[in-house]
Amino acid sequence: TVCNLRRCQLSCRSLGLLGKCIGVKCECVKH
């Protein structure tokens, strides 16, 4: 599967984090 950046950012934003694609993985990182 490919990382969907927009969906990744949305799900991370709800945690107060920044969404980033690392390879095929969605990573939530601090701003």
From Swiss-Prot:
Transmembrane segments: none annotated. Signal peptide: none annotated. Expressed by the venom gland. InterPro entries: Scorpion_toxin-like_sf, Scorpion_toxinS_K_inh. Keywords: Calcium-activated potassium channel impairing toxin, Disulfide bond, Ion channel impairing toxin, Neurotoxin, Potassium channel impairing toxin, Secreted, Toxin. PROSITE patterns: SCORP_SHORT_TOXIN. Pfam families: Toxin_2. Its main location: secreted. The record marks 1-2, 7, 24 as: Interacts with KCa2.2/KCNN2 and KCa2.3/KCNN3. GO terms for molecular function: ion channel inhibitor activity; potassium channel regulator activity; toxin activity. Changing residue 7 to M: 35-fold and 2-fold increase in potency of inhibition of KCa2.2/KCNN2 and KCa2.3/KCNN3, respectively. The keyword Transmembrane does not apply. It is found in: Secreted. Residues 6-9 are annotated as: [R/K]XCQ motif. The keyword Disulfide bond applies. Disulfide bonds join 3-21, 8-26, 12-28. One of its GO terms (cellular component) is extracellular region. Belongs to the short scorpion toxin superfamily. Potassium channel inhibitor family. Alpha-KTx 05 subfamily. Blocker for the small conductance calcium-activated potassium channels. Shows similar affinities for KCa2.2/KCNN2 (Kd=22 nM) and KCa2.3/KCNN3 (Kd=25 nM). Has the structural arrangement of an alpha-helix connected to a beta-sheet by disulfide bonds (CSalpha/beta). This is Potassium channel toxin alpha-KTx 5.2. It comes from Androctonus mauritanicus mauritanicus.
